[in-house]
Amino acid sequence: MALLPILEVPDPRLREKSTVVEVFDDNLQRLIDDMFETMYKAPGIGLAAIQVGVAKRLLVIDLQQPEEGGEAKRNPMVFINPELTPEGEEKRLYNEGCLSVPDQYAEVRRPSVINAKWQDRDGNFHEERIEGLLATCLQHEMDHLEGILFIDHLSRLKRGMLMKKLLKERKLREDSY
C-alpha cells in the first residue's frame, strides 16, 4: 500500500466530474487500499478518488468509532458508482470539513435521509436507506464526484472568508519552512 498525495483547493482537478468505474481489477483494489491508507493517515473519515487525482466514481468512508480502550474500531466502506436520492424534505445541519480544504470547517445543510445504490469493491450491487453521519458523509463525498466542494454550499461571503483564511494559513506554513 502507498500514501497518495491529496489534492487541495484551488487545484482545478477537484472540479472535474468523475467517470463510471467499469473494470474491477487488481489496479482498482490497490487504489482502494491506497485510498484507505491515505485517509487514515490524514486523518479523515471519507475520501473520493478525485481527491487523489483519479477521476473515477469511487469513494471510501470509515466512521471509526472509538472503543472503550481508546482504539478506533475500523469499519471501512467502499462505494463505487454511487447514486443517491434524498428521502423526504427533512434537512440536517452538520459542521463539515474536507481533506482538500484543510483545517477549514463550516455548517452545511443536507438531506437527513437518503436512498443509496452502489457497487462494492467486487462489483456487487447494494441498495440501502441511510441516515445520520453516514448520510452526510456520503453526500459530501458524492459531491466530489460531481466536482463540487462543501464550500460551494456556502454563501459567497462565507466561502470568500474561508478561502482567504485557508490561503493565509497555507502561506504561513510555507513561510515557516
From Swiss-Prot:
GO biological process, one term: translation
EC number: 3.5.1.88
Family to which the UniProt record says this protein belongs: Belongs to the polypeptide deformylase family.
CDD domains assigned to the protein according to its UniProt record, in alphabetical order: Pep_deformylase
Coiled coil: none
Protein name per the record: Peptide deformylase
Catalytic activity: N-terminal N-formyl-L-methionyl-[peptide] + H2O = N-terminal L-methionyl-[peptide] + formate
Highest taxon above the source species: Bacteria
GO molecular function: metal ion binding; peptide deformylase activity
Enzyme class: hydrolase
